[in-house]
Amino acid sequence: MKKISLPKIGIRPVIDGRRMGVRESLEEQTMNMAKATAALLTEKLRHACGAAVECVISDTCIAGMAEAAACEEKFSSQNVGLTITVTPCWCYGSETIDMDPTRPKAIWGFNGTERPGAVYLAAALAAHSQKGIPAFSIYGHDVQDADDTSIPADVEEKLLRFARAGLAVASMKGKSYLSLGGVSMGIAGSIVDHNFFESWLGMKVQAVDMTELRRRIDQKIYDEAELEMALAWADKNFRYGEDENNKQYQRNAEQSRAVLRESLLMAMCIRDMMQGNSKLADIGRVEESLGYNAIAAGFQGQRHWTDQYPNGDTAEALLNSSFDWNGVREPFVVATENDSLNGVAMLMGHQLTGTAQVFADVRTYWSPEAIERVTGHKLDGLAEHGIIHLINSGSAALDGSCKQRDSEGNPTMKPHWEISQQEADACLAATEWCPAIHEYFRGGGYSSRFLTEGGVPFTMTRVNIIKGLGPVLQIAEGWSVELPKDVHDILNKRTNSTWPTTWFAPRLTGKGPFTDVYSVMANWGANHGVLTIGHVGADFITLASMLRIPVCMHNVEETKVYRPSAWAAHGMDIEGQDYRACQNYGPLYKR
């Protein structure tokens, strides 16, 4: 089966079409802007899969309708998913703009005095606004000389932010969300909303009963040689934690081996269902070998599966990590309890950063006073105002232990193409696999247990659906916190100590939901959240605006908020603008 090509970035150099001196004097400068933009993007960006980003430049500068149409024909044949229009001069606004209604688009108007690039930028954006096709504005803060071919830092930041978000939009379009099972324990996020995926993300939902997973395991619809490799890898790398079950519920060695085997098989079969596996065709399973073209998935698990079969914790944790028995590779996006809305937040974070995502319960707010009462310890530093306990039995990527290191030796989570095998091994070494608690998981299983290193910047996100409004996005930038071991142990043993933990301290602003840490917890819209490495809330905001998803809560500095220029016409408060603009334009793929 032919591999689906990755979306490309289209670069549209536009120019003043007047011949006999004007156009001729601008051709080289205009095309050089396009080439410089393409060079920047190809150097600084990668797709989430790790592949290099490709740019497609119009064959000629665009002065009017004919050249715009020729450019569009080229872009259509090359899978261009977003466009950047560049110019150093006046051009003919509505005659030269990109009119595709769903493709993210930006315009960079050169800030120079010789020719009025800013005037074209304003005219073109006015046309976009009038026609209901929002576009992003890029205009340098400082005047440049006409022969200056450099890209200023503020322009570069906007070009890269737009491109990261635009690539995420283009990469999700046409893919599917694999809903493996149904609603888990009444969790609203697992009431999978097909209209949301279709209208806002351009995706389909593939609904598959969990009996399909059972069928694949029982009928050996998998690569048996790979299973043996996975078992050998687990035997070498898995460290097992204590079994906290009562004696009558503890499994013997043979039973535990069967649980491990099935857990690894679940990982293999869910992966094969998502992306396909050509080796299944070799054993006569051609239909199953194709997969479901899923860029994200969710597994219901509880309780209809987990009351009799091993839970999804091991499978989910390994799939969401950047490595397994096949080595370092791109992490998958698999939401525990089939929480599709948390899965979408995971998908956004992965597409923007190329990193694994940490799925967690937003479990407990610990005030400084409560911690001091329980442990005698007084919080300080990043934790001085209190912390949130992020913990879940399921799909927290092992990368979340933060045993990888950045260029300065700090703990982090890297894009998978930067992770060494030694760093993957360190994450595995920092993880214990604890037998699942019988009261929760009667069919057994293994839960990963690790503790996230402290001082690491994270962005916590969540998508919620509000009746009458549609989807909204929540964002909270902050840091992981490291507590003294005895303090962590006391707090952790008050909940389920066999699960992975991140102690999270959001950055406070003193206003609204970020007045204090309690307010962050109180305003969080659901029981789950996602941790993405770094303070990348601004990228989430830009991506959300492209999809027409308003942001209902964030602590990103106002100077970093970057949305289409038409948002400014929807009022004077930037967050109110966001709601009104998203309502006005409606979902990106209106249905």
Curated annotation (Swiss-Prot):
Protein's pathway: Carbohydrate degradation; L-fucose degradation; L-lactaldehyde and glycerone phosphate from L-fucose: step 1/3
Name assigned to this protein: L-fucose isomerase
GO cellular component: cytoplasm
UniProt record similarity statement: Belongs to the L-fucose isomerase family.
Gene name in the database record: fucI
Positions of Mn(2+) binding: E337, D361, H528
InterPro entries in alphabetical order: Fuc/Ara_isomerase_C, Fuc_iso_dom3_sf, Fuc_isomerase_C, Fucose_iso_dom1_sf, Fucose_iso_N1, Fucose_isomerase, Fucose_isomerase_dom2_sf, Fucose_isomerase_N/cen_sf
CDD domains xref list: L-fucose_isomerase
Source domain of life: Bacteria
Active-site residues (renumbered): E337 (proton acceptor), D361 (proton acceptor)
GO molecular function terms listed in the Swiss-Prot or TrEMBL record: arabinose isomerase activity; L-fucose isomerase activity; manganese ion binding
Record carries keyword Transferase: no
